[in-house]
Amino acid sequence: MIPPSGAREDGVDGLPKETASAEQPPSPASTGSQESKLQKLKRSLSFKTKSLRSKSADNFFQRTNSDVKLQADVLAGVSPGSSPLPAPGSLTCTPTRAGLYPGGGGKAHAFQEHIFKKPTFCDVCNHMIVGTNAKHGLRCKACKMSIHHKCMDGLAPQRCMGKLPKGFRRYYSSPLLIHEQFGCIKEVMPIACGNKVDPVYETLRFGTSLAQRTKKSSSGSGSDSPHRTSTSDLVEVPEEADGPGDGYDLRKRSNSVFTYPENGTDDFRDQAKNINHQGPLSKDPLQMNTYVALYKFVPQENEDLEMRPGDMITLLEDSNEDWWKGKIQDRIGFFPANFVQRVHQNEKIFRCVRTFSGCKEQGQITLKENQICVASEEEQDGFIRVLSGKKRGLVPLDVLENI
C-alpha cells in the first residue's frame, strides 16, 4: 500500500530535523592540526627542561633575551582552551651575581713573586714548591698563602682572609718542630703598655713555673736540697729575718721560682739567696739547673742560643713549655726544651763513638754515632743503662766515650 504523500513528507522532513539536532563530529583535518600543535608544545617544553638540567646555574642565568622571547612566542601560540601556564615574566627573574657567590664581594689575593727558603707546600695542590735553581712561587701579601704559578687558576671562587692576628711566631730550624703554615699560634706575647704587664698573664706564668719546679725537685734525689744550720743562715742573711714580707720581695725581684721549704724558712731563704746572686756558693742549685745538649740547634733569631751536641747549658728560665732560656759560657739565649737532657748529680755524660743497634727483647736501645746520652748506674757485665731523650736502655760500654 502506498502511503499518503503528507506522511512521506513528514518522514522525510523528520530525518533532516533529527540529524540537524544532533552534534556534528569534528572534521579529521581540524583534529590533526590540534594534536600536532600539542605535540610540538610538549616536545619544546621537554627539550628545554632537559637542556636546563644539563646546564649549570651560571649558564641558565646568563641566557640571552632571544631565548626568553622564543619561549614567550611558543607559549603565545598555545590555544586559549588549553591549561594556563605561568607568565614568561616569572621565568626571567634571575638572582644577582652576589647571590651565586656570597664571597664575591671579598678582597682578592695580592700575589707576589717569592723565593721560599724552607720547604713549603702549595695550598691548592698540596705539592712542594720546587724550582730549578731556587724555590720560586707566588705568595699573598696579606694572608701569606703560597701557591704554584700553575695553580693560579684554581683560586677563582676563593677570597683573601686578610692578615693573621699578631702573635709570637717562631720559625724553627729542626724538622721536628716545623708547624703547618696556617697552624694556630701557641704562644702570645704578654699585653704590655710601657712598663705595665698584664697581671693575669704574670700569675699564670708564675703558677706554671712553680708547678714544674716542684715536680722536678720532688723527682730528684734528697741530696739536691741545701743543708745549712739556722745560725749560719741568720748570720749571712740578717736582713731577711725581719718578717715574711722579705721573702715575697725576693720572689718578686727574681725571675726564678723556688721550691717549697723542707727544713723551715731558713732553707728557703738560703736557696733564694743562692739563685739571686748566681754565684758558686753551693753546687746543688747549679747541679739542678744543668743540662746537656743532645742535638745541634741553629739560631733563627737574635735571641736564640746556638747549641752543639755535648754543650753544657745552665738553665735560667723554664716558664714556657717549648722554649727555655739558658746560658752556655758567656752566651745567653732561648733554645728548644726537647733538645736538651737534664744532668743530675753523680751522672756521667757519654758520646757514642759508633752506631749500635740494640735488641728490644733484652732491654737494649739503638744509638747513632756521636749521639749524646747520660748514665747514672755502674757497669754490669760490660753493659750500662743510659738515658737519651725519651729512650732508656742498656748499651755496651765499649761504644761509649766519657765526655
UniProtKB/Swiss-Prot annotation:
Localization annotation: Cytoplasm, Cytosol; Cell membrane; Cell membrane, Sarcolemma
Region feature Disordered, mapped onto this chain: 1-43, 212-253
Keyword Transport annotated: no
Record's bilayer topology term: Peripheral membrane protein
Alphabetically ordered keywords of this record: Cell membrane, Cytoplasm, Membrane, Metal-binding, Repeat, SH3 domain, Zinc, Zinc-finger
Amino acid composition bias (Polar residues), ranges on this chain: 21-36
GO cellular component terms attached to this protein's record: cytoplasmic side of plasma membrane; cytosol; sarcolemma
Main location per the UniProt record: cytoplasm
ZnF Phorbol-ester/DAG-type span: 108-160
Molecular functions (GO terms): transmembrane transporter binding; zinc ion binding
Record-level GO BP terms: positive regulation of cation channel activity; positive regulation of protein localization to plasma membrane; positive regulation of voltage-gated calcium channel activity; skeletal muscle contraction
CDD domains listed in its UniProt record: C1_Stac1, SH3_Stac_1
Presence of the UniProt keyword Zinc in the record: yes
Record-annotated SH3 domain positions: 286-345, 348-403
Subunit text: Interacts (via SH3 domains) with CACNA1S. Interacts with CACNA1H. Interacts with CACNA1C.
Record function comment: Promotes expression of the ion channel CACNA1H at the cell membrane, and thereby contributes to the regulation of channel activity. Plays a minor and redundant role in promoting the expression of calcium channel CACNA1S at the cell membrane, and thereby contributes to increased channel activity. Slows down the inactivation rate of the calcium channel CACNA1C.
Protein name: SH3 and cysteine-rich domain-containing protein
Organism: Bos taurus (Bovine)
